[in-house]
Amino acid sequence: KKIENIFYSKTGIKLFHGTLNIELETPYELENYWIIGKDEYGGTQDVYVQECKVLKQKAYIVRSEKTAHKSNVIEIVSDINFRENFNLKDEDYISVKI
């Protein structure tokens, strides 16, 4: 819960509980990111956060220090449920503006 409170204080949005993982055609390294430190939320890894747009909606890429995902997969958080709101299914193609 604490990470959601930190996110709210930094962005003003209340996160939907859950993430949307997007596989990109090429690897992606975060740019212009900010960090939620492990000490801030009581975790074991820093979390890197970069703003983006998914289907024209404001969202954030989150990546932990030691992510289990390949570098061409980005994990998205937002205040909306993309799967429900846009009827998304696995393997769908969507637009992401980074």
Regions found by a protein language model. Give the residues of each.
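Long, compositionally biased stretches
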Residues: 1-71, 90-97
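Core nucleotidyl-transferase/polymerase catalytic module
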Residues: 75
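Short alpha-helix capping/helix-loop boundary micro-motifs
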Residues: 78-85
